[in-house]
Amino acid sequence: MQDKLFETSQKMPKFEFNQAVTDVFDDMINRCVPFYQHLLQQVAQLVGRNATVYDLGCSTGALVPFLKRRYSNFNYVGIDKSRSMIEKAQQHVGNNIQFLEGDLLDGVVFDQPTVIICNLVLQFIHPSQRKALIQTYMGALPKGGKLIIVEKVRQKNEALQQEYKKSYHELKRANGYSQAEIDHKDHALNGILVSETSEFYCDALGAAGASTIDTFFKWYNFEGMLGIK
């Protein structure tokens, strides 16, 4: 279903991952996140063979087909607090695939994970709580385990931040959104999606015990970061 949620000129409520968003989410994220399919392919490649993967904030489980195409043996647990997202994710069936409804702030019970993924999820959690979560997730991994974080980040330099925002809006217009839709969604996300700098995440990964930290994906204000314990 095509995303037309923000066409209305009426006052928009704050953004939430409800049924209306779930219904159009796959279209929305592919039009709003640059190179999203390629990004999922990169994440799947980083997972590696024989992995036990926890996908935190898994939404509709879009990573699963990429894992299936690449690996014959893996275990996957997807967790999301949106019931409608979890219900839609159930389409990705498999004996080694499990989806759970749960709030990351209530804690996650891990069972020997080798890879933990936070794909565009920490940005929806208050910045004051993110470092503690990263510490917890890194602590749950064995030596050599991977924490993969993908975020929409902000720049320290305000002029550069505005230049990147302009480029991002150009991308969304090229993908069929009107400027009015873009503005309406920005308003709905204000205070809901709060970006931090890439330095913030790299510092948090280092403090949590990552021995190797690298950026594997970057497009203006979107970054994929890898921490290896």
Predicted features by range, described:
Residues 11-12, 19-37:
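Class I SAM-dependent methyltransferase Rossmann-like catalytic core
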Residues 54, 61-106:
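Class I SAM-dependent methyltransferase SAM/SAH-binding core
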Residues 214-229:
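Core SAM-dependent methyltransferase catalytic element
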Residues 153-206:
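C-terminal alpha-helical "lid/dimerization" subdomain adjacent to the S-adenosyl-L-methionine
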Residues 117:
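A conserved beta-strand element that flanks and buttresses the S-adenosyl-L-methionine
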Residues 144-152:
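Conserved beta-strand signature within the Rossmann-like core of class I S-adenosyl-L-methionine
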Residues 34-51:
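Conserved alpha-helix/loop element of class I SAM-dependent methyltransferases that forms part
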Residues 131-143:
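A short glycine-rich, Lys/Arg-flanked "PGG" loop and its adjoining helix->strand segment in the class I
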